[in-house]
Amino acid sequence: MSQSDADALPNVHVRAEVLVQALPHMQRYDEEIVVIKYGGHAMGDRAAAEDFAEDIVLLEQSGLKPVIVHGGGPQIGRMLDRLGIKSEFREGLRVTDEATVEVVEMVLAGSINKQIVGWISAEGGKAIGLCGKDGNMVQARRATRTVVDPDSNIERHVDLGLVGEPERVNRAVLDAVLKAELIPVLAPVAVGSDGQTYNVNADTFAGAIAGALRAKRLLLLTDVPGVLDKDKKLIPELSIEDCRRLIADGTITGGMIPKIETCIYAIEQGVEAVVILDGKVPHAVLLELFTDYGAGTLIRRSGA
């Protein structure tokens, strides 16, 4: 044995320990569907994006059936600015008119979707890019939002334009893709019963897909470590009841509330558990699925 081989032995032992730890997790998820929502913010880091694609290919090669749903808010914003189209947000959602929805579809179902497919292909995977309109996979209805004025306590409706929420998922399209051993990469653009195109929030879209597929896990990759308590410390696990209590007492606020609502919906539709985790952490998906420690906040129907 050469000196260089001898020096490498400690690292080999560490890698062996990692593989031993990962094996039972791989067996647990064999042939199981895992839906992963990949946010637009994470795509800005090319190295992190390539790591993500590598992880997805490894999941597929390990026997899992990954389904990717991606966002693209920052990229949409930049394109709207470039085209001189003003954009407005209400209640955390982009108000979408006819001009905006054309840009949303172009960016999400076009450039971003194919970019992710390309990254996965470069790592040796076989991915196919689709949006909710393809095969009438996701039918949406116009989203409605009601807010309460804190001063008068009067409810008012917020018009979001062509923002949709999933009404029906045709899982036969996804079943066919998965049976062909392809990795679906889905853009959250859907169609209404009248043929109208709708911009759907990526978290909401991912929750509907996961629920329809009865996925083993739904992973929501975000730009925060997970759900935080009032001291800004990570909460490792929550039940649905815990989530509702933390919303009521003001611990969970702002943009985390719709994410939690998506988690609750998905679990009630049959998803075993949902994890909110930081997509900027290298190999966060593998850490969550294939290690004893996990990553982020695990949400399930009831406490362990």
UniProtKB/Swiss-Prot annotation:
Residues at which substrate binds? G72, G73, R94, N199
Q: Does the keyword Zinc apply?
A: no
Q: Which Gene Ontology BP annotations are present? A: arginine biosynthetic process via ornithine; L-arginine biosynthetic process
Give the source's domain of life in one word: Bacteria
Keywords on record:
Amino-acid biosynthesis, Arginine biosynthesis, ATP-binding, Cytoplasm, Kinase, Nucleotide-binding, Transferase
Q: Name one GO cellular component term.
A: cytoplasm
Which positions does the site annotation Transition state stabilizer cover? Answer: K37, K259
Q: What is its main location?
A: cytoplasm
> What is its pathway?
Amino-acid biosynthesis; L-arginine biosynthesis; N(2)-acetyl-L-ornithine from L-glutamate: step 2/4
Q: Which GO terms describe its molecular function?
A: acetylglutamate kinase activity; ATP binding
EC id: 2.7.2.8
Task: Give one Pfam hit by family name.
Answer: AA_kinase
Q: Which reaction does it catalyse?
A: N-acetyl-L-glutamate + ATP = N-acetyl-L-glutamyl 5-phosphate + ADP
Alphabetized Gene3D superfamilies for the sequence? Acetylglutamate kinase-like
Q: What does this protein do?
A: Catalyzes the ATP-dependent phosphorylation of N-acetyl-L-glutamate.
Annotated NCBIfam families: argB
Among PANTHER family, the record links this protein to: N-ACETYLGLUTAMATE SYNTHASE (PTHR23342), N-ACETYLGLUTAMATE SYNTHASE, MITOCHONDRIAL (PTHR23342:SF0)
Name the protein family.
Answer: Belongs to the acetylglutamate kinase family. ArgB subfamily.
Q: What is this protein called?
A: Acetylglutamate kinase
Origin organism of this chain?
A: Methylobacterium nodulans (strain LMG 21967 / CNCM I-2342 / ORS 2060)
